[in-house]
Amino acid sequence: MTEELNGRRIVVPEARELGQLVRMLEERGAEAIPCPMIAIRDAPDAEPVAAWLRWFVKGTCDDLVLMTGEGLRRLLGLALRTDLEPAFLDALRTTRKITRGPKPVRALREIGLDADIPADEPTTDGIITAMRRHDLSGRSVGVQLNPGNPNRRLVDFIEAAGAVPYPVLPYVYVSEADDARVLAIISDMAAGQFDAIAFTSAPQARRLRDVARATGRDADLLQGFRRIVVAAVGRSSRQSLKRLACK
């Protein structure tokens, strides 16, 4: 691994764990080029999330669908700031927890809890498949949503199963690096100035695409993808890149 990365120039679009990824690559001899595409922020209007927390701590939530580890951590953070953390943790312990993929499982373990129903695969379809095995009739189901995805398919499934969904969106994505920096990365990719780019989330790829489209640089972006190695962590990242014509 060290020999494979020695001297390689690798673009890192990550924001939250940027320092860790840069150190990991540099320890293996690579030159990491940071360009954080997306930052994660608490929902700008905290009141709907706080209202959801007040409902949740009443203990009337039967099931909680956790799409991401970040979602649980953001809920915990707001619970702490609103003096609801003990009640929130108590309610979590007695609520059946349904998780999509390893990240929400990891976030639960950080607070000494486990998933009760892990999805068959880390997708909405995987969650629905897992939930079909259980009678949901009459149950109250909290649903932690992802930014930009109201997930009507999951919400509709829950309603069709006779349950009542209670969605919550605890965080949002915002642009991090300015457009000029992103455009410079696109130009250098097209020119073959890098060896690889490593995506850790779908929103990173979408930001790159959006900047390219807005500036008429789609062809440069596709050329860049074809000239360098494109790495993706996680299924959603891979799917986003496939839609951008990456193999």
What are these model-derived regions, one by one?
Residues 1-247:
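Signature of uroporphyrinogen-III synthase
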